[in-house]
Amino acid sequence: MEQATFGVIAIVPPVLAISMAIATRQVTVSLLGGIWIGWVIHAGGNPLQGTAQAISAMIEVFADPGQTRVIVFTLLMGSLLILMQRGGGIDGFLNWVSQWKWSRTRRGAQLMASVIGLGVFIESNITCLVVGTVSRPLFDKLKISREKLAYICDSTSAPVCILLPFNAWGATVLGLLSAQAALGNLGDQSPLSIFMAAVPLNFYAVLAVILVFVVSITNWNIGPMKVAERRAIEEGKVLADDARPVVADEVIMIPRKETVAPRLGNMLIPLFGMVVMVFAGIGITGSIGAREANILDPGLFDIMNQGSGSTSVMWGVLLGLALMVLLSVLQKAFSMQEFVDLAFKGAGGILPLAVLMVLAFALGDVCQALGTGPWVAASVRPFLTPVLVAPLVFLVSAFIAFSTGTSWGTFAIMITLAVPLVSLFNSESVVVSLPLVVSAVLGGGVFGDHCSPISDTSVVSSMASASDHIDHVRTQLPYA
């Protein structure tokens, strides 16, 4: 997409969208407002031309294969989750955990949700959907607020995914670092070695993961979360009276079919197959990509670098769905018509989320067209001294991610800016740690994404937990 420089006015669309989301509690309308005003600015103030461009931009989201795959596998995940619910997988899991004393306590339930979040690390949105769907019945039974569940969903998604190279997030970052390696900006270090060295230095992500376990174990509730938890315990209300859940419970939570027995395997087998397929998918797409790039005898890094994270995740969800269908056929759980109806019902339940993702992608596109991220980065570049480079890179990355709602877009902007700058400093015999600066980009991007009300991960967390979105953002912010 063509990118121009519009100066300080480039930050108006994200600022407007965030302000409207907080003021109106309507994320969809807020994103639409940000998209529209952005394209009006791009059109030189012409509202008619801006409106036409805004409509085209929302349609053109599907022109990007990666974005389209994310939307498709999110809808398919809705189908898989509802089949697991109706097919007795979720009840089977809940029956299994109910045998253990720890599952009957608030601490145990929160720890269970946190551990599930660690285990499903293939993609942040899938982590949120699985944790929310599996944990919500137990949290409601124990009167744990939906805001707390949304916090656990959010804090075990992006912060966990960014610490691992073998998932969609790792593949994206390695691809960006490989582009810098081709320009000679990594010196004698490989992209994978830089990524792995940056992991323990990614203080925000590491601390976010540690904190969610501390909160789960100690039940440490502060600020708005303390109010939400007190309401849930004393009044038995898991939602505030004025809450507006992103999706109603009855849309995304259906009971097990009466003739179907609870079976733990109906949840674990599809999820395990999905995770395995993601690893295999990265290997397959990476091998194909390496061959197309004329890489002879590709190694592990070459395969990971050439692999497609979004394709692998989509294959994983498709395999999980196929396994769930196979199990149901073997168990004679559903008729073919029931399969079709449930699949569409599950995808339909996720549809509001898919719409929000389209709008979030479209807002990111208008920010790219206006040069929002590059303008913010260029504004602080004169202040990037060797001592301040890592802290400022973190702050700028956080601001861009918060404003645009995308950590991946932030990575693309800031790695392109920060890595060559570090290379320049090092060529002048001024030592600046490249892994530290890369970790600042990644940590800042996750921090901004974690806090932003227009972030897709935050919206998915709210939806998966059936929580009010702005309540989720407000209660999570003190921890973030």
Regions found by a protein language model. Give the residues of each.
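Alpha-helical transmembrane segments of multi-pass membrane proteins
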Residues: 106-120, 144-170, 185-207, 228-231, ...
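Hydrophobic core segments of alpha-helical transmembrane domains in multi-pass membrane transport
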Residues: 12-23, 34-41, 73-82, 114-118, ...
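Hydrophobic transmembrane alpha-helices of multi-pass solute/ion transporters
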Residues: 2-79, 92-96, 100, 273-358, ...
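Transmembrane alpha-helical segments and their short flanking loops
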Residues: 45-58, 166-204, 211-212, 294-298, ...
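Transmembrane-helix bundle segments that line or gate the permeation/cavity pathway
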Residues: 128-132, 136-140, 148-254
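Membrane-embedded alpha-helical segments and adjacent helix-loop junctions characteristic
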Residues: 48-150, 333-428
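Long, contiguous bundles of hydrophobic transmembrane helices that form the permeation core
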Residues: 208-306, 318, 322-341, 464, ...
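Re-entrant/interfacial helical elements at transmembrane boundaries that shape
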Residues: 92-95, 126-138, 167-185, 212, ...
